[in-house]
UniProtKB/Swiss-Prot annotation:
Belongs to the bacterial ribosomal protein bL32 family. InterPro entries: Ribosomal_bL32, Ribosomal_bL32_bact, Ribosomal_zn-bd. This is Large ribosomal subunit protein bL32. Pfam families: Ribosomal_L32p (PF01783). GO terms for cellular component: large ribosomal subunit. The keyword Ribonucleoprotein applies. It comes from Sinorhizobium medicae (strain WSM419) (Ensifer medicae).
Length: 61
């Protein structure tokens, strides 16, 4: 059975655990509409992505 040669220091343990935290999703302000949206994603309200019309926007009832 594999046994560690040295005790893992609290610093090394913390560095390893730093990747386990849940990170909040990032949002950017859309240049055209001013709404918040995810980067590299289509704006669902306008249907635009990188200056091009990709989707037809849904009609609000």
């Amino acid at each position: 059975m594999a046994v560690p040669k040295r005790k893992t220091s609290p610093s090394k343990r913390g560095m390893r655990r730093s990747a386990d935290a849940l990170k909040a999703p990032t949002y950017i302000e859309d240049k055209n509409s001013g709404e918040l949206r995810r980067p590299h994603h289509i704006d669902l309200k306008t249907g635009m992505y990188r200056g091009r019309q990709v989707l037809t926007p849904k009609e609000s009832a």
